[in-house]
């Protein structure tokens, strides 16, 4: 009887086993054909960040959520490959995708635990999960994972599978793949890892957070020891190597991408262009973008701008703490402060610090290095009054305040970032390539790019476009214009009269067009615009690249009352510099894919080749010659310190000295400088273009043109010289004889018309207006009438 029972049971077991095998076979037959294609593995394209470079190959920007560096499996060191295999899959080179013995152990453990608590995922199974499956803990998912692992093993070599794993696996700290992890945790190339470091990294795949050596050093050390012991058991290392690795003290160094900080505004401009072209793929396809800027030029431009902004801010009162963090609820103040400071940048040698204690005796701060320093009243300097000053509210210096200090060793002083801002744009005049661009004092504190986004009044820097229109309309550099006061009843604010003036209160009477621009005479600019017509001027000035919205349809145009950007102004002046051609500013030169293949290359419009002719080359040349006088004897005399005879330019200052400009150029380079507060307010007596913008330009262009030969613009065909003045040939005997009074081009009524004597007029104007002083351009409130009708209405007002 007992024998029958045993026989029956054995039969039942065999039957059940066969039944189970049958079910598994059916499941495999049903599921296997539905498994996903392996195209994504066979043509692996990891998510690689967008990297932006300067023209000289320096990294200026990296964008992308995943920090990854694709590396071929043969380029990984053997100690790392051994460590990972010892940790994750000892029989990797022996199984067919699934480790049967490992599965058996895991099944027993899960049955004992009453659910899926652990797996026996091989490296191949992990590849299947990472690329295709979720992290759900279920038997169904594990079954699909096993089938997919088998399919992968049938299609790919072991080394290819290992390569996929080594590059795709997430290892914490935004690091994907072991090459990236080596940089992230040890700031090393993967081939420079020691055995101890390799074993530590090999412990991360199991649980990147739990075994993070920076956050959980003790657990990470236990995991490292486990892996080293496995390596010893597998004969991968010797006992001596294991013991030495266990004793090795590891030094963790957070990876900091070596990004040149001077070109961050340019990098952001390039990023925006890539995003517009490729969308989110811009951040995952590993594009390498080479820009047109040179890092040496960028650094000089940045420092030139910062120096002027710092000097202006010197003497200002302390405006208060930069920020505040609540330390009252922190269990570990030092760690809380360290983590916060790690998110901030040192700007212009101004180091961020957090106040730990604040009293009359002094202020204790913690630096990003973790070092604590006490500042006495002398070190606090102008910030001493802010210590626990309740009147300053949240801006006071107290425990938790974020401040800036400068210094080294034991000597630090409190400093603050300037409130005044500015921008610099330098273009290749012939192609529009941006050679340097600075959008503000510091990108990290304010990402707003004043070079491209700040719509500000250009002031007198806009006048050359109107003067160019006048030349196109028939005037010459020696046309006489009356520099006298003008009053327009009812055209000012609140219906009052508009009484524009020259800022120095001086009026020179009849002077030449050349002299008027050299001395930046507001009254002359207004009369010129009245003569040529507002409508004509609007249409003409669009040739320089300005949008209609940037050109006001009123006489205020003559004083630069419209709003535009420094970049647009620089583009406009490039027309004068290159002989009359319209070129487009651009920052991207070439785009490569992750394999180093050229995907796109800028084909710029080049002056004299394929760029459209915006204005008559003779017009551009005459304007260049006139603006050389602005540098020689006019409002930009500071630029003459360079000692170059090929420089020309124009300054600009708006109402109450709220905006200051200088745009200078030679036939090869155009550079515009803008200075002003983000919330417009007066800069005071120091806020003229000639006094605050010109010094920035001089320091930068002195470097940019160092070693280059002096080559003034050559006169184009059709330009003649008479009496020291330059003319278009056909106008030598016509309009150059005339003078412009209040109503247009005609002989002055007070005396017969005569040919102007340029040298005589120039000397007279210089004596009447010297020393030239920058004009502050009054902005009127005028109706939007345009063209000759407007001029005829104004004729009766004089």
Curated annotation (Swiss-Prot):
Compositionally biased tracts (Polar residues): 782-798
UniProt keyword list: Antibiotic resistance, Carboxypeptidase, Cell inner membrane, Cell membrane, Cell shape, Cell wall biogenesis/degradation, Glycosyltransferase, Hydrolase, Membrane, Multifunctional enzyme, Peptidoglycan synthesis, Protease, Signal-anchor, Transferase, Transmembrane, Transmembrane helix
Major localization listed first in the record, in broad terms: membrane
Region feature Transglycosylase, mapped onto this chain: 50-218
Location(s), subcellular: Cell inner membrane
EC number in record: 2.4.99.28, 3.4.16.4
Region named Transpeptidase: 413-699
Pathway annotation: Cell wall biogenesis; peptidoglycan biosynthesis
Gene Ontology molecular functions: penicillin binding; peptidoglycan glycosyltransferase activity; serine-type D-Ala-D-Ala carboxypeptidase activity
Annotated segments matching region Disordered: 734-798
Periplasmic compartment residues: 31-798
Membrane-protein topology: Single-pass type II membrane protein
One GO cellular component term: outer membrane-bounded periplasmic space
Cytoplasmic side stretches: 1-9
InterPro entries for this protein: Beta-lactam/transpept-like (IPR012338), Glyco_trans_51 (IPR001264), Glycosyltr_51/Transpeptidase (IPR050396), Lysozyme-like_dom_sf (IPR023346), NA-bd_OB-fold (IPR012340), PBP_transglycosylase (IPR036950), PCB_OB (IPR031376), PCN-bd_Tpept (IPR001460)
Regions annotated as coiled coil: none
Annotated active site: 88 (proton donor), 460 (acyl-ester intermediate)
Segments passing through the bilayer: 10-30
Chemical reaction(s) catalysed: [GlcNAc-(1->4)-Mur2Ac(oyl-L-Ala-gamma-D-Glu-L-Lys-D-Ala-D-Ala)](n)-di-trans,octa-cis-undecaprenyl diphosphate + beta-D-GlcNAc-(1->4)-Mur2Ac(oyl-L-Ala-gamma-D-Glu-L-Lys-D-Ala-D-Ala)-di-trans,octa-cis-undecaprenyl diphosphate = [GlcNAc-(1->4)-Mur2Ac(oyl-L-Ala-gamma-D-Glu-L-Lys-D-Ala-D-Ala)](n+1)-di-trans,octa-cis-undecaprenyl diphosphate + di-trans,octa-cis-undecaprenyl diphosphate + H(+); Preferential cleavage: (Ac)2-L-Lys-D-Ala-|-D-Ala. Also transpeptidation of peptidyl-alanyl moieties that are N-acyl substituents of D-alanine
Gene Ontology biological process terms in this record: cell wall organization; peptidoglycan biosynthetic process; proteolysis; regulation of cell shape; response to antibiotic
NCBIfam families: PBP_1a_fam
Family, similarity comment: In the N-terminal section; belongs to the glycosyltransferase 51 family. In the C-terminal section; belongs to the transpeptidase family.
Role of this protein: Cell wall formation. Synthesis of cross-linked peptidoglycan from the lipid intermediates. The enzyme has a penicillin-insensitive transglycosylase N-terminal domain (formation of linear glycan strands) and a penicillin-sensitive transpeptidase C-terminal domain (cross-linking of the peptide subunits).
Protein's UniProt name: Penicillin-binding protein 1A
Provenance organism: Neisseria flavescens
Gene for this chain: mrcA
């Amino acid at each position: 009887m007992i024998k029958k029972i045993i026989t029956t049971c054995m039969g039942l077991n065999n039957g059940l086993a066969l039944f189970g095998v049958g079910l598994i076979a059916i499941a495999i037959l049903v599921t296997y054909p539905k498994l996903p294609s392996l195209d994504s593995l066979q043509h692996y394209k990891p998510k690689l960040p967008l990297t932006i470079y300067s023209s000289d190959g320096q990294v200026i920007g990296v964008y992308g959520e995943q920090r990854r560096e694709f590396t071929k499996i043969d380029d990984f060191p053997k100690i790392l490959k051994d460590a990972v295999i010892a940790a994750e899959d000892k029989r990797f080179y022996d199984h067919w995708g699934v480790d049967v013995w490992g599965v058996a152990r895991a099944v027993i453990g899960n049955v004992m635990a009453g659910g899926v608590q652990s797996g026996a995922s091989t490296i191949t199974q992990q590849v299947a999960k990472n690329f295709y499956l979720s992290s759900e803990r279920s038997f169904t998912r594990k079954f699909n994972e096993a089938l997919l692992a088998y399919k992968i093993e049938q299609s790919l070599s072991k080394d290819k599978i290992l390569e996929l794993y080594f590059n795709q696996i997430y290892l914490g700290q935004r690091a994907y793949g072991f090459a990236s992890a080596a940089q992230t945790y040890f700031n090393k190339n993967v081939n420079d890892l020691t055995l101890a470091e390799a074993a530590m990294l090999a412990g991360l795949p199991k649980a990147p957070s739990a075994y993070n050596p920076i956050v959980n050093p003790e657990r990470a050390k236990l995991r490292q020891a486990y892996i080293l012991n496995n390596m010893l058991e597998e004969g991968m290392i010797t006992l001596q190597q294991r013991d030495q690795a266990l004793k090795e003290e590891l030094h963790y160094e957070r990876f900091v991408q070596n990004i040149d900080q001077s070109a961050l505004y340019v990098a952001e401009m390039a990023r925006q262009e890539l995003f517009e072209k490729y969308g989110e793929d811009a951040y995952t396809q590993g594009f390498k973008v080479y820009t047109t800027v040179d890092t040496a030029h960028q650094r000089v431009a940045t420092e030139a701008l910062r120096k002027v902004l710092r000097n202006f801010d010197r003497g200002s009162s302390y405006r208060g703490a930069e920020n505040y963090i609540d330390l009252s609820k922190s269990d570990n103040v030092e760690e809380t402060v360290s983590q916060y400071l790690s998110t901030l940048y040192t700007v212009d040698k101004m180091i961020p610090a957090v106040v730990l204690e604040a009293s009359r005796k002094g202020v204790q701060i913690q630096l990003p290095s973790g070092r604590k320093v006490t500042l006495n009243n002398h070190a606090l300097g102008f910030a001493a009054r802010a210590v626990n000053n309740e009147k300053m509210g949240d801006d006071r210096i107290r425990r938790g305040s974020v401040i800036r200090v400068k210094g080294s060793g034991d000597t630090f002083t409190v400093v603050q970032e300037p409130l005044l801002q500015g921008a610099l744009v330098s273009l290749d005049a012939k192609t529009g390539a941006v050679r340097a661009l600075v959008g503000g004092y510091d990108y990290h504190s304010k990402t707003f790019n004043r070079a491209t986004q700040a719509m500000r009044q250009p002031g007198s820097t806009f006048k050359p476009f109107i003067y160019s229109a006048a030349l196109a309309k028939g005037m010459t550099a020696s046309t006489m214009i009356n520099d006298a006061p003008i009053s327009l009843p009812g055209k000012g604010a609140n219906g009052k009269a508009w009484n524009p003036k020259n800022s120095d209160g001086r009026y020179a009477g009849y002077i030449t067009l050349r002299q008027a621009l050299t001395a930046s005479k507001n009254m002359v600019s207004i009369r010129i615009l009245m003569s040529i017509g507002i409508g004509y001027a609007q249409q003409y000035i669009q040739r320089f690249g300005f949008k209609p919205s940037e050109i006001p349809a009123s006489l205020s145009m003559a004083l630069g009352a419209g709003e535009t950007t420094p970049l647009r102004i620089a583009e406009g002046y490039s027309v004068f510099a290159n002989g009359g051609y319209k070129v487009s500013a651009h920052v991207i030169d070439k785009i490569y894919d992750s394999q180093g293949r050229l995907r796109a290359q800028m084909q710029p419009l080049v002056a004299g080749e394929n760029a459209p002719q915006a204005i008559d080359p003779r017009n551009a040349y005459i304007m260049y010659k006139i603006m050389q006088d602005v540098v020689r004897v006019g409002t930009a005399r500071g630029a003459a310190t360079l000692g170059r005879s090929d420089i020309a330019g124009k300054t600009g200052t708006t109402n109450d000295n709220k905006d200051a400009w200088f745009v200078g150029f030679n036939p090869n380079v155009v550079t515009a400088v803008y200075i002003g507060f983000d919330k417009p307010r007066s800069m005071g007596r120091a806020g003229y273009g000639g006094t605050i913008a010109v010094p920035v330009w001089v320091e930068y262009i002195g470097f940019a043109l160092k070693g280059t030969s002096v080559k003034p613009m050559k006169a184009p065909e059709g330009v003649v010289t008479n009496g020291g003045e330059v003319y278009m040939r056909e106008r030598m005997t016509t309009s150059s004889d005339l003078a412009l009074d209040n109503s247009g081009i005609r002989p002055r009524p007070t005396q017969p018309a005569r040919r102007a004597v340029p040298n005589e007029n120039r000397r007279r104007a210089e004596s009447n207006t010297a020393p030239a002083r920058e004009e502050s351009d009054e902005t009127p409130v005028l109706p939007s009438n345009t063209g000759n009708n407007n001029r005829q209405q104004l004729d009766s007002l004089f």
